[in-house]
Amino acid sequence: MSFYTSLSGLRAAQTDLGVIAHNIANAETTGFKKSDTQFADLVAGGAASDPRMMKGIGVAVSAIAQNFTLGAVEQTGNVTDLAITGDGFFAVRGGESGQTAFTRNGAFMLDQGGFLHDGAGNRLQMIATDGSGNPGASGATADTRLPLVNAAGADLAGVTIGKDGTISAAYADGAVTNVGRVALASFTSPVGLRPLGNSKWEATGLSGAPQIGFPGAGRNGTLLSGALERSNVDLAEEMIGLISAQRNFQANAKAIDTASQLSQTIINLRT
C-alpha cells in the first residue's frame, strides 16, 4: 500500500510542478492570472470505521484554483490600451463565432472598419448611451465601433476613453461624439470561470452569470487609458514554490525506493 501512497504523492507533486511552470512561463503575459494547486488527503475507512485505526492512503489534487489578484499596471501611452483598476472583466465577442468571452487584457486596437478589437479580432463590447451618458432602453451590449466619418463628412482624428468607460470620437472639424461606454462584467465567483487561453475566460455555472455594468459602478473598477495590466505572477514566489514542489517529488520518489528495498528484504527472507 505504501507504493500507492507515495505514487499519489508523486502525481500530486508533478501536477504542482506543471502549474508552477505554467505560471512562470506566463510571467510576461498581459492580463494573465496565476493558479495555485490545492491538495486533499485520502483516508481509508468508512462511517463504521474505528477513528483510532484509520490511516491515510495518500493525497489528491482537490483543485487548481485561479488567483484573480490584481497585476501591476504598466503605462503604454496608447489610448486604446485599457487597464481595470479594480474588479471586473472586459467583454469581447468573436467577430466570426459570435461567442462572448471575458478578459483582463485590455490591449485593443482600431481596425479599418472602426471596430475596437484585440489581437485575435475579438471586438470590445460597449453599452450605447444617449447624450447624457445614460444607457439606452435595452441596455444591451454591442460591438464598439467608431464612425470613421461624422455627419458633416469630417474624418475621425482620435479617440479618448474616460475612467468611467466613456468612449469619445474626435473629428477633424473639431466635433466630439460620445459613442458609448465600455461594458465591464463581474461575477459572483470569478474562480469558477473556465480558462480559454489567451487570457480569456468563459462563464460557467460555478462562476454565475455575468453581471454587465459600467466601470466604477457596483463592484467594477474604473478604467485607465494608455495602460495595461501585467501578469500577477510573482517570480520570486513561484521559484520558492518550484523548489518546494521539486523536493516534495524527490521525497515521494525516495519513499517508493525505500518501500521497494523493504519488499526486497522480505522476499530475501523467504528464499
What are these regions, as identified by a protein language model?
Residues M1-G133, G139-T141, L146-T271:
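Amphipathic alpha-helical polymerization modules
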